[in-house]
Amino acid sequence: MNTQITVKDIIDITMGKLIYGDENEICENFSRNTKEINQDDIFVGLKGDKFDGSKFYEDALKAGAKGCIINKVEGLEIKHVPGKFIIQVEDTVKAIGQIAKFKREKYHIPVIAITGSVGKTSTKDIIYSVVSQKYHTLKTQGNLNNHIGMPFTLLRLKDHEALVVEMGMNHFGELSYLTNIAQPTIAVITNVGTAHIGNLGSRENILKAKLEILEGLQKEGTVIINNDNDLLHKWQSENDHYKVITYGIENPSNYMATEIEYTEAGSKYKVNHNEEIEVPVKGEAFVYNSLSAVCVGKLLGVSEQDIAKGIKEFELSAMRLDIQKSEYGYTVINDCYNANYDSMKAALDCLSKMQGGRKIAILGDMGELGEYATELHQKVGKVAAEDNVDILITVGTEAKQIAEAAKANGLEKIYSFDELKDAIDKIKKILAVNDIVLVKASHYMNFEEIVKAL
């Protein structure tokens, strides 16, 4: 199987122009950051909102890149560097997608694509851990799941036997683009919630956008869905076109979590009352996430023992229910990468099942909710009260709705702040040994500053 890409291939794929260099040169590793260039990388100059990376092609060549793919930039003087190459294209973002698709089509391997309103990155991490027990597997790094990050993941394919990619979206058409590049053999949809509802208008529209992942699914491909999600359950019951495998806790499904227990070490359950699964994170959300990995593992012929081992040993990506023990004796649950109602609910569920001292929730604004912002922040407040949070601290304008709803539902110890620094001062004063602290908000709230302060 020839998986190599040459300069000539790139020119043909992108309709680009070779400014200078050898068209037979092999292009193996790609980078978009001149500060992270390794010897013989191919630098791709991407155009951002403020600048065009193509202008820094010389820096890339000096750093060791063997060639560059750049945009047509008005007034840019292209200097000839012996032994290097320069390809000029109309749009480097579009080009990197085209090259990634070309690369993907050279591989006849399982490609698992994951999308959903919440739990994508964690589910990807668990599935990767399970599939890796049998196959040499590549996965999306962190959450590089958009029209730039995902193509760069595909371009990292080497001698891999399986690929696990995460696909994110906040508008129609985005998953359609990604799935037609990745061409998955297995599509996993974790749930349809309220993330990006401000952009898409309704949960039904979110479902429609998530189902775009099926447009690139290979002909004999399989769809794996959370059968307890109301919209996915309805879609599945009406589906007669795709091969579907279901998982769940409540609705009858192909793979069900039964005899669920929450222990000091995490979560434990049996699959259809048979093999036991241990998840090193507490909470119902991770029972669901790990069940999807059971489905994928079974489909790819991973043994029961290796499925259980992969789930028990998986490692979470940064800032996703990352449980850290402080030197001062309290525990911090760092889940501050992003937030929507469904992920807030899952995080609070995890907090409620932790054993120790007081349960403190530090919650901030959730973005991209549009006209649903007030309602969904209030719902989070209600959940915080129902999950018996001992102390609630909110930061931000929208998060005041969380505080008000929590108070209305019986939670007494509540502190609201407009500024992070004021919240941090308060937190430091009230924290005690054995406390368990959840830190969660949308990424733009910069809640990682709270975690650093703790």
Model regions and ranges:
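Mobile, glycine- and charge-enriched loop segments
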Residues: 34-45, 137-138, 148, 152-163, ...
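Short beta-strands and strand-loop turn motifs
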Residues: 71, 109-115, 188-194, 226, ...
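ATP-dependent carboxylate/acyl-activation modules
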Residues: 114, 120, 318-322, 444-452
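N-terminal leader/targeting and accessory segments in enzymes
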Residues: 1-95, 256, 354, 382-383, ...
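Active-site beta-alpha connecting loops in nucleotide-dependent enzymes
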Residues: 48-51, 317, 336-410
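Acidic, Mg2+-coordinating active-site environments of NTP-dependent enzymes
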Residues: 74-80, 188-331, 356-357, 382-385, ...
